[in-house]
Amino acid sequence: MLPLRLASLHKLCREIDTLSVPGDVVECGVYNGGSAALMASVCTRSLLNRSVWLFDSFEGLPEPTEKDGDKARACGWWCHGDLSKVRTIFQKLGVPESCIHIVKGWFQDTFPSVRTGDIALLHIDADWYESVKLCLERFYDSVQPGGFVVIDDYGHWEGCKKATDEFLRNRSLDVTLTRVDYTGRYFQKPLKPAQAQM
C-alpha cells in the first residue's frame, strides 16, 4: 500500500473519533498487516473502545472471474499474506490482543457466521469483483451514519470498480467517491438528518 493511502486511513481513523461515530473497524484483505496495524494503533487508543476485525484467507486471492477483465486474469499475482507477520507487527506496536479479531478463511465461508456489530470504518482491499461485492453486501448495512467505506483498488482493478459502482447504483446511494491516489477511493455513509444539522 502506498503512503498516500496509509495517510488517508490514518486521517479517517481520527475522523471517526472526531465525529463520535460508534462501532469497530473492519478490514477485508489484510495481506501482511501494514494497514491493519496502522488503523489498530489509532483505533485501539480511542475513547470509544474500538476493536479491529481482520478478514483474510492468508492463502492468497481467489482466482479472478470474467468480470475482473483480462488484466486481472493475466496477472498471476495472488498476494499470499502471512498471519505470523500480522501478529508480530501488532506485538511490536503494543496493540492489545483483546482488541484484535482475526478471522482466517475465504470470505464466503467466514462472513455468514461472524457478527461484528456496528462498524465505523470499513476498509476493503479485496481486488476482485466477487470479493468486493461480498464485502459491501455483508458489511455496508452495519456501517454507521458518518462512518467511512474505503475501497483500496477502485482505480486499478476493473472488477473492483464494477462491484463498487453496481452496489452504489443498486442501493441508490448518493455519495461522493473521494480520490486518494490513482486507485484508492473512499466515501462517507450519509448522516441522518438530525446529525447533519448538528
What does each of the following model-derived ranges do?
Residues P3, R14, L19-M198:
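S-adenosylmethionine/decaboxylated-SAM
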Residues M1-S8:
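Conserved SAM-binding loop and adjacent beta-strand
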